[in-house]
Amino acid sequence: MKLNTLFNLNGAKKCSKRIGRGIGSGKGKTCGRGAKGQKSRAKVARGFEGGQTPLIKRLPKRGFKSMNKRNYNIINIITILRLVKANKIEYGAVIDKLLLLKLKMLKKSINKIKLLWANPSSLVLNSEDISLLTKLDLQFNLDEYSISARKNIIKLGMKVINN
């Protein structure tokens, strides 16, 4: 076997149709497009429905993507309480982005972090949890705080470093 004797099997490569090369080719003159009309002359525009108002124009405009949207990683005080109970946060710790990344509590490091206080409808902090938080003397260095979170942190004797 030599390189100059190699060839493809029958049907391995299909030849492209040569259109517009005379009547005898089978695809001459109108080139398989038929006679006259919009489709014989050029492509029909995308979304064109034959003169009927296109779907894209029939539907109302809806919404947009805000350029100024702020993406936050949400951290709840109950999550921090669980970390305290699991001995992952010690006395006097500064809770910031680096600590939360180290503990794998954040999805993305590029987003800002917002601290929320416990949602009264789902999980409520009991007196044991509150006393545990006050003993630890935690300091928070996060980007944003909910109003109730900031108020309760200061009330319990913990510190908000920024904002």
Curated annotation (Swiss-Prot):
Species this protein is from: Orientia tsutsugamushi (strain Ikeda)
GO molecular function, one term: rRNA binding
Presence of keyword RNA-binding: yes
GO CC annotation terms, alphabetical: cytosolic large ribosomal subunit
Taxonomic placement: Bacteria, Pseudomonadati, Pseudomonadota, Alphaproteobacteria, Rickettsiales
Alphabetical GO biological process terms: translation
Subunit structure: Part of the 50S ribosomal subunit.
Described purpose of this protein according to its UniProt entry: Binds to the 23S rRNA.
Name assigned to this protein: Large ribosomal subunit protein uL15
Keyword annotations from UniProtKB, A to Z: Ribonucleoprotein, Ribosomal protein, RNA-binding, rRNA-binding
InterPro entries: Ribosomal_uL15 (IPR030878), Ribosomal_uL15/eL18_sf (IPR036227), Ribosomal_uL15_bac-type (IPR005749)
Gene: rplO
Record-stated family: Belongs to the universal ribosomal protein uL15 family.
